[in-house]
């Protein structure tokens, strides 16, 4: 990867602005902040660059409403679309956001066909599928931000339960980025000790872990209900930056993301949250976990929900 890659952020709302700030603080590359709303990306770019003078960052941020400015982007994060409001599911956004994603995909295909693309727009698993099909980019270069965020929420709740640092907790959440996602307690650990073993030690109960799993599934909705005017943006932005950094710096981290499946987990031609290795080529490998019959059934149910939504937009 070049020394100063060009990073494009499509959508300059709460997540887009937070992304620009985090990326500049990490000095990952120069940024183009795009939005259809005039003045918004330009104003946020100026504000963040002025803030960066206090953080010692000289990263350049260009705010624009012109798709021509995205030409030659090395990496793209897409947040454009309507956010959730109280009472809405991620799936309620499908009609409007599909149209937005198709327009974005056409311009990515035209101006940045070699970029690595991370989609955040909801409903995530459908939007990343639309991006792949409409842009014509290779599937290893188009992924969705889902499991990193869901796992971070699961990690936080587990750390609270066991009264430990979040740094000691590692978890995996599979499936679609929706209410049927599959947090896997069996593959989640506190400093290497699986959650079921900690339950056997009397440090928690199966009932309490199930409540945490349910809270993880509804983690986004909980924040939407509290904010009342939008959805989460700090954690989604931090999650996408983790993915971006692994690509730009060839870290080859194993992260749970919405990846295109070609037979893994018994699924073909669909995006779903699974562990993958992200390196300089994008998706380097899909990690196929050995699931129990019950875990596979839950995964299949989650994926079926994604499949039905995709059929609705075809």
Curated annotation (Swiss-Prot):
The keyword NAD applies. It is an enzyme of class 1 (oxidoreductase). GO terms for molecular function: L-lactate dehydrogenase activity; L-malate dehydrogenase (NAD+) activity. It comes from the Bacteria. The active site is at 177 (proton acceptor). Substrate binds at residues 84, 90, 122, 153. It holds the Pfam family Ldh_1_N. Signal peptide: none annotated. NAD(+) binds at residues 11-16, 35, 97, 120-122. It catalyses: (S)-malate + NAD(+) = oxaloacetate + NADH + H(+). Keywords: NAD, Oxidoreductase, Tricarboxylic acid cycle. Its EC number is 1.1.1.37. One of its GO terms (biological process) is tricarboxylic acid cycle. Belongs to the LDH/MDH superfamily. MDH type 3 family. Catalyzes the reversible oxidation of malate to oxaloacetate. This is Malate dehydrogenase.
């Amino acid at each position: 990867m070049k020394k100063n890659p060009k990073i494009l952020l499509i959508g300059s709302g709460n997540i887009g602005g937070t992304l620009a700030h985090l990326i500049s603080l990490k000095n990952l590359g120069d940024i183009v902040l795009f939005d259809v709303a005039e003045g918004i990306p330009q104003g946020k770019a100026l504000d963040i660059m002025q803030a960066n003078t206090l953080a010692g960052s000289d990263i350049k941020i260009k705010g624009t409403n012109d798709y021509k400015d995205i030409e030659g982007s090395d990496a793209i994060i897409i947040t454009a679309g309507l956010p959730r409001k109280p009472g809405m599911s991620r799936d309620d956004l499908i009609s409007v956001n599909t149209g937005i994603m198709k327009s974005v995909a056409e311009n990515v295909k035209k101006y940045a066909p070699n970029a690595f693309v991370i989609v955040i727009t909801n409903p995530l698993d459908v939007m990343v599928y639309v991006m792949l099909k409409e842009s014509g980019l290779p599937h290893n270069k188009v992924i969705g931000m889902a499991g990193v965020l869901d796992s971070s929420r699961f990690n936080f709740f587990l750390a609270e339960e066991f009264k430990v640092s979040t740094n000691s907790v590692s978890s995996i959440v599979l499936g679609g980025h929706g209410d049927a996602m599959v947090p896997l307690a069996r593959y989640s650990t506190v400093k290497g000790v699986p959650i079921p073993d900690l339950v056997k030690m009397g440090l928690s109960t199966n009932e309490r872990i199930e409540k945490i799993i349910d809270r993880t599934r509804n983690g986004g909705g909980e924040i939407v209900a509290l904010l009342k005017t939008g959805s989460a943006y700090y954690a989604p932005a931090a999650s996408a930056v983790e993915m971006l950094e692994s690509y730009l710096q060839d870290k080859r981290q194993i992260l749970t993301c919405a990846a295109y499946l070609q037979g893994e987990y018994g699924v073909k031609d669909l995006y779903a949250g699974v562990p993958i290795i992200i390196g300089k080529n994008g998706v380097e490998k899909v990690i196929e976990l050995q699931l129990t019959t019950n875990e596979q059934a839950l995964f299949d149910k989650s994926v079926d929900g994604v499949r039905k939504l995709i059929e609705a937009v075809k």
